[in-house]
């Protein structure tokens, strides 16, 4: 059961993941710091930061966004999982956040909208982000929370909740059927 599904939340025990954060929005601030350090060291590294749309109602996200724009961090790519749900329910009911694309664009980011379940479109979005110069990029990936798992799809109550063994097995089976 060594997968994200079995834990309910992310972890840092993967070589490609330098840190995992969450709903308080510290992840983007850390990513901005890493992107600045990479530029200062001429390391040529790209920094990727995955955000949930529930955490962008935190002020720290917008402070980090302003900083990324100010320093023209074109080595920073933010991916926003825009599924419309957070732990407390629907985004528009909890935070009232609207026009996400416009907000990030107004802060000076290159905005790329994509179907987050379409792998070829995601690859194209990452290629575009890599070629973008002078500004940070955000890929807004429109997704469905729990897509492909009948009892999880579109349900906020599965946020941060690990499934029981029988639920886990059913979820894995449904996901396998979906990719065959």
Feature map (PLM): residue ranges:
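Single conserved hydrophobic/aromatic residue that forms the stacking wall/gate
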Residues: 2-13
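Glycine-rich ThDP/TPP pyrophosphate-binding loop and its adjacent helix/strand module
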Residues: 11-180
